[in-house]
Amino acid sequence: MLINYIMDIIEFKDCSYENKHLVGGKCSSLGELYHLSQKLNFHIADGFAITTHLYDSFINQNNLQDIIENTLEQIDYNNIKNIEDNSKMLIDKISNGTFSESQQQSIAVFYNKLCEKYNIVDLDVAIRSSAIAEDLPNASFAGQQDTYLNVKGIENVLENVKLCFASLFNTRALSYRHSQNIAIEEVKISVAVQKMVRSDIGSAGVAFSLDPESGYNKAIVINSAFGLGELVVSGGVKPDEVICNKATLKDIEADPIIMKKMGDKSSKIVYSH
């Protein structure tokens, strides 16, 4: 599918690995998952990507590019207080920036369209970071930027999108990029706006297409716990773990499960209405 590459917002159905430079790693994967869901008839929570093009425009129209570059050049990465102070300054500058009228209208149109799809006024959404430098071969950016859950109403969506933009410069992200010698020019951020799902009656987790500890690429590793996935991602709970053999997944007579290990799952995070 041909995409207009100057678009500020792209729905999940039009996201793919082909426009990863616009929508980042997470949104491109969500787009691929959306396409797969249409073929195999399963559901995913729908949404849209606010692209790196809109992020660039936001930074430039608020005259922040020079401030960002000058600040990054003078950070003392051997001084944690210095990193924190400069991080806070950049986060404050970005979160206090303003969207143009056309940007606000564009985001509102797609948010309202999502509300209409699910027939819910002021639909609860997750505001999720999707950086273009996510999961490089020699580096992983999982958890570096921020995610905001259960965001309701267009004004709150706009504010949390700015916070997501700003999280590109939080202390852990700055320190990690410096340790990996990744220049800021290599990193931009897209933002996923995605419908929230029920967490009180379900579970969440992560799946890896290889063993993240050993690098063994013939296995799939799945970790899952009750409620939202935050505790799994942050290591705050011991999840269930299942390891599958890729070679036997398509053999209906074979058991693909190599190992199952039950975690204590001692707590869960749910949305308190």
Label every model-predicted segment.
Residues 2-192:
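N-terminal beta-alpha lobe that positions the nucleotide/phosphoryl donor
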Residues 138-140, 204-205, 231-235:
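Short conserved micro-motifs at the rims of enzyme active sites and ligand-binding pockets
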Residues 148-152, 207-210, 243-245:
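Short beta-strand-to-turn element immediately C-terminal to the catalytic PLP-Schiff-base lysine
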Residues 202, 209-212, 223-230:
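Glycine-rich phosphate/pyrophosphate-binding beta-alpha loops
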